[in-house]
Amino acid sequence: MKTFAAYVIIACLSSTALAGSITENTSWNKEFSAEAVNGVFVLCKSSSKSCATNDLARASKEYLPASTFKIPNAIIGLETGVIKNEHQVFKWDGKPRAMKQWERDLTLRGAIQVSAVPVFQQIAREVGEVRMQKYLKKFSYGSQNISGGIDKFWLEDQLRISAVNQVEFLESLYLNKLSASKENQLIVKEALVTEAAPEYLVHSKTGFSGVGTESNPGVAWWVGWVEKETEVYFFAFNMDIDNESKLPLRKSIPTKIMESEGIIGG
């Protein structure tokens, strides 16, 4: 098994509390090459405050967060009282939605798990531009640019975030260090649990901006963290996507890398 000490190219990340440096592990690129995918994976180990990536340049490049933005959106909704608590039910109005799994009443956890865009668009509209902007600044979340529409700025407009910034934000959430109540951070963390194995626990969220074109591809994300014994691993993956058939790769590629590092699986 490779270790973090084996990574060879070092660059300073002065902006992050998680890591004093990030190393480049080009051996991870074989997982991207095997699927003919352009993308980046950032993996950080909490105890050593160290991060690694397959691509230093792309790790700091900003992209639309797409539905990974449901994480801060949920926290902001709770902080502002738009979401009353974790038990609140978001009623379906009976009108057709883009996905059948959205056509039902949903709790906060349910809405996050099925990535119900209409629910979070309504939350954003009720939060409003002024409060949304205030919290994104407090969270140091990406470009903090919400122009283009309060219910779509994270889906198709100006908000951007890098893989490095994603793991910084997730670490702050994990440690309850965001400018938000501990209770509300705990609610959202619980809603993000996507795998509970005997040896580890995964909190995560996917994102997908749409396929785009070959010359102007969309972006697909998987971000989160793994709790294993006394260690925590934060991760962020994004990839270019011009064909929806490639969408499962947003999870399968980082999963293979984390399996090779002995973090999940087996």
UniProtKB/Swiss-Prot annotation:
PROSITE patterns per record: BETA_LACTAMASE_D
Catalytic activity: a beta-lactam + H2O = a substituted beta-amino acid
SS bond list: none
GO molecular function terms attached to this record: beta-lactamase activity; penicillin binding
Keyword hit for Hydrolase: yes
Pfam families named in the record: Transpeptidase
Keywords, ordered alphabetically: Antibiotic resistance, Hydrolase, Plasmid, Signal
Catalytic class of the enzyme: hydrolase
Record PTM N6-carboxylysine, positions in chain: 70
Protein name in UniProt: Beta-lactamase OXA-11
This enzyme's EC code(s): 3.5.2.6
Lineage: Bacteria, Pseudomonadati, Pseudomonadota, Gammaproteobacteria, Pseudomonadales
Keyword Phosphoprotein: no
Domain of life of the source: Bacteria
Residues reported to bind substrate: 205-207
GO annotation (BP), single: response to antibiotic
